[in-house]
Amino acid sequence: EAEPHSTTVGPVNGVAGVNPANLRRWFDKRVDGFGDDPTFEQIQGGHSNLTFTVRDGSGRRWVLRRPPLGHVLATAHDMAREHRVISALADSDVPVPTVVGLCEDTTVNGAPFYVMEFVDGIVVRDVATAATLPIKIRERMGRSLVEVLGRLHSVDVDAVGLGNLGRRDGYIERQLKRWRAQFEQSTTREVPRVLEVHETLVARIPPQQGVGIVHGDYRIDNTIMTGDGEIAAVLDW
């Protein structure tokens, strides 16, 4: 039996991008004891997708991610892909939030979205935030970033079910081709040296040694840190 949905997908109660009535029904079916009077607050700082904190009447929190409002490129805002990666890494050595569920029915909230558990911690978005932390904690954060990145690159993509996430061959060649196309589309003058460097790199592509996961935007403010300087979760996949 189909459940009823409100058709409002614009600003609701002052929050654009969420439909409280529909989302309440969605949460009720997937979260035991979901409380009354949920609130939705957009988390500032992200630019690729809209991210909201969802809080029920008892104070429990979750995080909802959806594409930006308006026309978007599906490949750049693929919620199912992001949900799949985080779910696959749940039992790995890479810390990620626990996933609650994915919704690809756009009648619920105007666009696909997924929900994950809220991870408490520190997000170092700028120098001012970092300056409030002791030197030893900042040092540990830096080391943790490197260690977790190494763990990510060591994940066996087939073992975690991501072996078919993307093409497995010719990664460097495809990257060089993309960069040249982007350069040619954006340049307004002749820069022959750039093309010379491109041709040199193409001629020296090393043999591929394996297949791994590349985050694509791995940086400190796409992580949540503990007070001890350890990564609690890697975000923005």
Task: Name what the model sees in each region.
Residues 2-34, 38:
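Juxta-kinase regulatory segment immediately upstream of eukaryotic protein kinase catalytic domains
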Residues 3-5, 178, 231:
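Short acidic (Asp/Glu) and glycine-rich catalytic loops that position anionic groups and cofactors
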Residues 37-213, 226-229:
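ATP-binding pocket architecture of kinase catalytic cores
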Residues 213-215, 220:
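Catalytic-loop of the protein kinase fold
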Residues 233-236:
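Pre-DFG segment of protein kinase catalytic domains
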